[in-house]
């Protein structure tokens, strides 16, 4: 018998301010990879993390 897939998946978090902000320290978009449990957290994740491009803590949202 085959084992079922695990509940944990790898997701990518992207800075929300990098897309619209033109006065940044450096060009580009900040992205972090992390894991989430699909069964416990069904909605999209949003975490405040440090963005090296904006040089401050910003909201990072889960992208596909």
Curated annotation (Swiss-Prot):
One of its GO terms (molecular function) is structural constituent of ribosome. PROSITE patterns: RIBOSOMAL_L33. It comes from the Bacteria. One of its GO terms (biological process) is translation. GO terms for cellular component: cytoplasm; ribonucleoprotein complex; ribosome. InterPro entries: Ribosomal_bL33, Ribosomal_bL33_CS, Ribosomal_bL33_sf, Ribosomal_zn-bd. Pfam families: Ribosomal_L33. Keywords: Ribonucleoprotein, Ribosomal protein. HAMAP family: Ribosomal_bL33 (MF_00294). Belongs to the bacterial ribosomal protein bL33 family. This is Large ribosomal subunit protein bL33.
